[in-house]
Design a protein with these regions (language model features):
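Conserved beta-hairpin
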Residues: 54-76, 81-83
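Residues that line or immediately flank small-molecule/substrate-binding pockets and catalytic motifs
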Residues: 77, 130, 158
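Generic structural signal for beta-strand residues in well-ordered domains
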Residues: 53, 113-116, 134
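Terminal substrate-recognition subdomain of acyl/acetyltransferases
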Residues: 1-42, 62, 80-120, 147-309
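Conserved beta-strand in the GNAT
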Residues: 68-79, 105-109, 122, 127
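A short beta-turn/loop motif at secondary-structure boundaries
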Residues: 52-55, 183-185
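Conserved acetyl-CoA-binding loop-helix of GNAT-fold acetyltransferases
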Residues: 125-148
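Short, basic/aromatic recognition patches
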Residues: 40-52
Length: 309
């Protein structure tokens, strides 16, 4: 389909119009839409074509000039989860239901249950014809969605590069999460950014951004130095105690809990939690990963029980 897509030479005199399109409209002009996605996006695969036909809760936005498709956004509706027990299970790492990629990630990693409760739209794909890139089409598409989408916040997950981070920042998004591992598809760390729209969405963006900025200096993430701050916050807050509890007694990941663990150990005797302190030095989980994690969780759990007495 990429070969069938007809590219349009850049012409600054042409007027670009942005509209929302239904799934039926996209499918009726499939060669054009999917051709653009394949031309401009490394992640687009035949599986995406199947999703176009089968998946529900999709939204599409097109930037056109004289019936030529110059740019497009493919977005997915997320959030609106009303089951509080399910949300708590997601936060603890006990459940990972299908879908809701960003709400689940923020609920689990940043402990923000509101991310699951609020309604959001995730930008799954954004593509602009190569000859029309760097001319504001992508920014205009995002601004149109911001003004017209009836949701609490927008989100995007992307392979982190300085250039992409700057683009999303220019569009009004705040970086709120960095994945632990390099993605096979991009060779980059996955990143999540948010843009609040409603009052609750704006508050969620603020909380998520502040939490990210507060915790990244105390993580062992390879990109932590990119986000260096003047001072490191060592104070144990309620969110840290929740992080410690969910690591010790449930399935919170070590990487997500690490800033809280480092704050916790800062207030303890140097002889406390020797396995965890060894991990701080070696960056290696003791023994094999499964049993080593159990030991680290147990060490923190025992200390939490003593501190609670």
């Amino acid at each position: 389909m990429e070969d069938d897509f007809k590219q349009t030479p850049y012409d600054k005199s042409k007027v670009c119009q942005i509209t929302e399109r239904s799934q039926e409209e996209i499918l009726s002009s499939l060669t054009q839409f999917y051709g653009l996605m394949t031309l401009a996006h490394y992640r687009t695969s035949p599986l995406d074509l199947r999703r176009l036909f089968d998946a529900n809760s999709q939204c599409f936005f097109a930037a056109e000039s004289e019936q030529n498709l110059l740019g497009a956004v493919w977005a997915l509706e997320e959030g609106g989860i009303e089951d509080s027990a399910l949300i708590e299970a997601i936060q603890q790492g006990n459940r990972r239901p299908k879908g809701n990629l960003v709400p689940q990630a923020l609920c689990f990693h940043a402990q923000l249950q509101k991310a699951c409760e609020l309604h959001s739209l995730r930008i799954s794909r954004i593509a602009v014809q190569p000859m029309w890139q760097q001319h504001g089409i992508g920014t205009q598409l995002i601004e149109y969605i911001t003004q017209n989408a009836d949701v609490d916040y927008l989100s995007v997950s992307f392979g982190y590069t300085k250039e992409l981070a700057q683009f999303w920042q220019k569009c009004g998004f705040s970086l709120v999460h960095l994945g632990e591992h390099l993605e096979a598809s991009s060779g980059c760390y996955s990143a999540i950014a948010l843009k609040g729209i409603s009052a609750q969405g704006i508050e969620l963006e603020r909380e998520a951004s502040q939490s990210f900025q507060r915790n990244i200096p105390l993580s062992f993430h390879p990109l932590a130095q990119v986000f260096t701050t003047i001072s490191v916050d060592w104070e144990l807050l309620d969110e840290d105690w929740l992080s410690l509890k969910n690591f010790a007694y449930f399935h919170r990941s070590l990487a997500s809990a690490l800033p809280a663990i480092r704050r916790f150990l800062m207030n303890l005797d140097e002889k406390d939690c020797p396995l965890m302190r060894d991990y701080f030095i070696t960056k290696q989980i003791p023994y094999n990963k499964k049993n080593g994690l159990k030991l680290l969780r147990s060490e923190i759990a025992q200390k939490l029980k003593k501190e609670a007495k």
